[in-house]
């Protein structure tokens, strides 16, 4: 059973993961409007950055319409109660970028690594703690690690100073049992004072269900986004999660009607590619592929006259992970040569 008295930390990711859905092209006016609506609806934190984190704007990942710091400052200017979060991937963002994000208004940082590479996060986690930031370890592609292995990686991040460890279903490839096993393993090894979080993707339509199961196993923080705005088929849709949680009597602290209105009136009209489960986004969950590969794979498929589905499935077979976007072209050329 889920503790109905426990306050769930609602972490919105519309302005970070949602960047993938608009090719990192949110205007400053758009981020301010979305953030204001989220703040008024009662979310606890609002993550702001390029889809691939601080300094993700690049040829490899896609150029942003603005800098991370401009987006963060635009949000900081309008929010009254929610804390601003940001994402940092070691090797893309640096501690200098983190300081700039802090100066712009960010007070939570999620330091993200592949689920086998927690050791590269030490410098960034320690520096974030020295700034007094709420510091989170974010283990991407968690389906590619065993529950025990993932827990060991989480313990490493905790030892560096992380105050919360996230199970991150970047591929939207896990089911409820997968989530339960990973949270049980985490709770077995982490200090009771260390929180845990869930970041779902909706590629198998399990984003909300997986988030609820995470709560059943002691999860403290839940990521979600308006309309599910995010990579692939998106994240757990925030307005849906909040409605489901309310029907279960859970303490999420948000105004469901305000979330629904913000989703429909502000965010959904911005989707140039509808965020939903379809042939291509289902391929991500089916093959266990990093969700942000979607738009890159679609571009490669269009360029070479191939099926996006086939490219994504082959990427899954090769166990490609975040940061290997350049391999999408290699896979496309291999498929082309195979006829």
Curated annotation (Swiss-Prot):
The active site is at residue 20. Residues 8-260 form the Pyruvate carboxyltransferase domain. The record marks 16 as: Transition state stabilizer. Substrate binds at residues 16-17, 170, 199, 290. PROSITE patterns: PYR_CT. It is an enzyme of class 4 (lyase). One of its GO terms (biological process) is catabolic process. One of its GO terms (molecular function) is 2-isopropylmalate synthase activity. It comes from the Bacteria. Its EC number is 4.1.3.39. Mn(2+) binds at residues 17, 199, 201. It catalyses: (S)-4-hydroxy-2-oxopentanoate = acetaldehyde + pyruvate. Keywords: Aromatic hydrocarbons catabolism, Lyase, Manganese, Metal-binding. CDD domains: DRE_TIM_HOA. The keyword Ribosomal protein does not apply. It holds the Pfam family DmpG_comm. HAMAP family: HOA. Belongs to the 4-hydroxy-2-oxovalerate aldolase family. This is 4-hydroxy-2-oxovalerate aldolase 2. It comes from Pseudomonas putida (strain W619).
């Amino acid at each position: 059973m889920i503790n109905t008295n426990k306050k769930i930390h609602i972490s919105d990711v519309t302005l970070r993961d949602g960047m993938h859905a608009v090719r990192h092209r949110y205007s400053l006016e758009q981020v301010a409007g979305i953030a204001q609506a989220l703040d008024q609806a009662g979310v606890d934190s609002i993550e702001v950055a390029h889809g691939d984190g601080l300094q993700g704007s690049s040829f490899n990942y896609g150029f942003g319409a603005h800098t991370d710091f401009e987006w963060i400052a635009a949000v900081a200017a309008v929010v009254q109660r929610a804390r601003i979060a940001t994402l940092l991937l070691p090797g893309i963002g640096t501690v200098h970028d983190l300081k700039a994000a802090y100066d712009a208004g960010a007070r939570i940082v999620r330091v993200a690594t592949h689920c086998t590479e927690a050791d590269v996060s030490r410098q960034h986690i320690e520096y974030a703690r020295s700034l007094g930031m709420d510091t989170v370890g974010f283990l991407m592609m968690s389906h590619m690690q065993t529950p025990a292995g993932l827990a060991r990686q989480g313990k490493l991040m905790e030892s560096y100073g992380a105050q919360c460890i996230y199970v991150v279903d970047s591929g939207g490839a896990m089911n409820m049992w997968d989530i339960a096993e990973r949270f049980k393993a985490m709770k077995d090894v982490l200090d009771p004072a260390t929180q845990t979080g869930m970041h779902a993707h909706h590629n198998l339509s399990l984003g909300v269900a997986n988030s609820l199961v995470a709560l059943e196993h002691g999860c403290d923080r839940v990521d979600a986004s308006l309309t599910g705005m995010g990579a692939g088929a998106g994240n757990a849709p925030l307005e849906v999660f909040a409605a489901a949680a309310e029907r279960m009597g859970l303490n999420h602290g948000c105004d469901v009607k305000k979330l629904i209105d913000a989703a429909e009136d502000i965010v959904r009209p911005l989707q140039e590619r509808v965020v939903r489960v379809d042939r291509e986004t289902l391929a991500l969950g089916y093959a266990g592929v990093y969700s942000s590969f979607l738009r890159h794979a679609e571009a490669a498929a269009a360029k070479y006259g191939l099926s996006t589905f086939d490219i994504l499935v082959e990427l899954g077979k090769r166990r490609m992970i975040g940061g290997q976007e350049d391999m999408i072209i290699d896979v496309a050329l291999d498929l082309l040569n195979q006829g």
